[in-house]
């Protein structure tokens, strides 16, 4: 009987370990929480700096986003309560604080990060403060320069697509982020009605461009 319990315990531990190892969140999320991001203005000059960190309170985990402007003055802070569920990091409560508008608490179900499925993109829909987004996570290949070193890497590309109408005019906002193992999110682009710019960039990133799998295999050699 004792051997049966030990065997059952070992099998349960193996199953738990297999599930835990299926998605390596620590390779993408924890590096992201230790990085500094620069946001340029329309002329390419530094507009603000964003820093991320993690906190645990009681049995809850939080991702803290702090935006600084000027001489180190905090202009906004967002606290995301989050959990991991299957292939995604999900926030179910957000506390948004702004120096001008005060604090507002939201309970939107937002996916902060998601792994693609093994052989196809992972897709979902979400509502962020009343705006509806169609989202996709997929594997792509990139050439990026980090710390002035050119690297060819497999990355996760996450897009959030929001189409809306003002009056009779149609508008579209497309957010595109690239995530890399051991670095987290390295850059986010925002395309507003066809005008694309980098809205948030890892401070150690020099450049990044998406390449084909054929180019990746050729250049990686």
Range-by-range predicted roles:
Residues 21-221:
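Conserved functional acidic sites
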Residues 1-25:
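Bacterial Sec-dependent N-terminal signal peptides
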């Amino acid at each position: 009987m004792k051997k049966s319990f030990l065997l059952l315990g070992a099998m349960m531990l193996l199953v738990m370990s297999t599930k835990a190892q299926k998605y390596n969140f620590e390779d993408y999320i924890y590096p992201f929480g230790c990085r500094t991001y620069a946001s340029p203005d329309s002329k390419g000059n530094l507009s603000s700096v964003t820093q991320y960190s993690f906190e645990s309170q009681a049995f809850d985990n939080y991702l803290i986003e702090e935006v600084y402007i000027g001489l180190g003055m905090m202009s906004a802070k967002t606290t995301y309560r989050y959990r991991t569920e299957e292939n995604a990091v999900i926030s179910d409560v957000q506390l948004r604080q702004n120096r001008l508008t005060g604090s507002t608490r939201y309970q939107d179900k937002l996916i902060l990060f998601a792994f693609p499925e093994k052989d196809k993109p992972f897709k979902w829909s979400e509502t962020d403060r009343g705006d509806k987004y169609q989202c996709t996570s997929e594997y792509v290949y990139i050439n990026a320069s980090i710390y002035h070193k050119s690297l060819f890497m497999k990355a996760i590309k996450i897009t959030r697509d929001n189409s809306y109408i003002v009056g009779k005019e149609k508008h579209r906002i497309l957010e595109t982020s690239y995530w890399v193992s051991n670095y987290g999110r390295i850059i986010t682009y925002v395309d507003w009605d066809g005008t694309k710019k980098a809205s948030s960039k890892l401070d150690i990133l020099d450049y990044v461009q998406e390449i084909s799998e054929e180019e990746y295999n050729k250049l990686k050699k």
